Amino acid sequence: MRTFIIKANEAHTRPDFKLNDLPGTSGRIDVLCRFLNSAFLLSHGFRKNVRVWLLLYGPPEPPKAIRFEGSRLKVRLNPDERSTARLIVKALKAGGGLREPGKEVEVYPGLYVSNRTFEDVVRLTLKNSAIYYLHEEGRPITDIRFPQNVAFVLGDHKGLSPEDEAFLDGIAERVSVGRKSYLASHVVAYINIFLDSLPNPP
């Protein structure tokens, strides 16, 4: 199983944005749409061995945790950002009345929303997966021997805060796909391709 966790510092937590202007009105939910498509989509297929957590920390009701479970997902992911953003809108609407942090609502089969925090999701993932934090100064990904259950933590265009990084220290090994800062969607695509090339891929 491959899990990808991305923290979106400014992504809106209420569906108050325009689908025709995601970059300008949503706190960059367009970044999350591209991330999802890179995590799941193949040229002529869909990755069922992938789980994605979108952790939204923008206004007005942070946090919101949206989980896409590839093995159970019934709704179609298309390459365009608009249709993917509609799924996020549906999740935010379904999660609007949530009060309990641990309660998760199923929006569609394989699509869930909750009020879990970044720390909650990392701790939950740690129970079943080795966790890696994508960082420019990390150990080269080509040097890592990956187990069968892996999880990768990424920041959005703003990155993770010093507090987030301090929390990950001792929990997640820092790994790098290169010494430059790359787009999150490109990073997840590269990781999938790299893992696919291993003799016994996760």
Curated annotation (Swiss-Prot):
SUPFAM superfamilies cross-referenced by the UniProt entry: alpha/beta knot (SSF75217)
EC number annotated for this UniProt entry: 2.1.1.257
CDD domains membership: TrmY-like
Subcellular location: Cytoplasm
GO BP, one annotated term: tRNA methylation
MF (Gene Ontology): S-adenosylmethionine-dependent methyltransferase activity; tRNA methyltransferase activity
Binding annotation for S-adenosyl-L-methionine: 134, 155
Chief localization: cytoplasm
Described function: Specifically catalyzes the N1-methylation of pseudouridine at position 54 (Psi54) in tRNAs.
HAMAP family: tRNA_methyltr_TrmY (MF_00587)
Family listed: Belongs to the methyltransferase superfamily. TrmY family.
Protein name: tRNA (pseudouridine(54)-N(1))-methyltransferase
Organism listed in the record: Thermococcus gammatolerans (strain DSM 15229 / JCM 11827 / EJ3)
Gene: trmY
